[in-house]
Amino acid sequence: MEPLRALELYSGIGGMHQALRESCIPAQVVAAVDVNTVANEVYKYNFPHTQLLAKTIEGITLEEFDRLSFNMILMSPPCQPFTRIGLQGDVTDPRTNSFLHILDILPRLQKLPKYILLENVKGFEMSSTRDLLIQTIENCGFQYQEFLLSPTSLGIPNSRLRYFLIAKLQPEPFPFQAPGQVLMEFPKTESEHPPKYAINAEKKTEEKKTGPKICFDSSTQCSGKEAILFKLETAGEIDRKHQQDSDLSVRMLKDFLEDDIDKHSFFLPPKSLLRYALLLDIVKPTSRRSMCFTKGYGRYIEGTGSVLQTTEDVQIENIYKSLTSLSQEEKIMRLSMLQLRFFTPKEIANLLGFPPEFGFPEMTTVKQRYRLLGNSLNVHVVAKLIKILCD
């Protein structure tokens, strides 16, 4: 097989490139494109022999695209226009312009690529931009399948539910193709169970209007229970976390932790402990789960990722018992017994599937590393999709 010639758009720190390597598909990345200067430094540090174009995608002409002579596109367009916490500007968001430029260029290429893989946030599947993408690739003759996948399905203790699309230039559909459906798991062989469907794409307009109640985790049922237990958690949330920690198909976090680190430099400051005590998602090295790490991790506390309890012999329930009735000093003393720390950038990179040799230039700060990793993707998930796509 001739090595594939892959074009990596919105390359970031090189998650797609790393996944392509892991897939063991013979391939060369002919060019990577990104405007983020810090991300580009990290990319060059890890992939020094790849042509890196530090320019906007809108600035690349049809002729320049043709000259690159690629037959595969790997891309992870900006997710902010589609996030739940963003404004969801969709096609009207200026950050979508570069992707619209790609959709405009694609049908006019001298030679269409054979393969396309796209990653984005959950929510992209409900967007007008997604509709334009589907319309464009269908008109070009691609067969495609959409997915919503999390690394937990590969035994990795990190929730990072993301949208993926794989497309292949061929007349026959994929063996697992489910028209109008978004698959919630990797394709099974015929001897295994049929795939789960998340969304019927035809009905998504009505779903937008009614605002469906969605269970994001297939391991638990949507529960009406609202009993607040310790911290600001409902009985349903506690139950879900216990179920995740009991799932023996998922590895423990300790497999992904660094041995020799200065723990103290990653401890949560007392002010954060006081302010966010009831909102923290606390995990232990023996836990089999962690929240999605976002680009604000280490800087913001709420909703940006889990924190690690390093004293395993202390029961968290005992620490939180009657916490609200204590003075500030007593609260800090009690919470400090948990020795809560942030995950290090290296540990997050491990959970995202980057190999041990993947590194950061010394000049990059911890804050920059968190930000870049929060914008990246899970290498193992993408590697598996590349194998499925090229099979």
From Swiss-Prot:
Keywords: Cytoplasm, Methyltransferase, RNA-binding, S-adenosyl-L-methionine, Transferase, tRNA processing. The keyword Transmembrane does not apply. The active site is at C79. One of its GO terms (biological process) is tRNA methylation. Residues 4-391 form the SAM-dependent MTase C5-type domain. GO terms for molecular function: RNA binding; tRNA (cytidine-5-)-methyltransferase activity. Its EC number is 2.1.1.204. PROSITE patterns: C5_MTASE_2, SAM_MT_C5. One of its GO terms (cellular component) is cytoplasm. Belongs to the class I-like SAM-binding methyltransferase superfamily. C5-methyltransferase family. Specifically methylates cytosine 38 in the anticodon loop of tRNA(Asp). Has higher activity on tRNA(Asp) modified with queuosine at position 34. This is tRNA (cytosine(38)-C(5))-methyltransferase. The gene is TRDMT1.
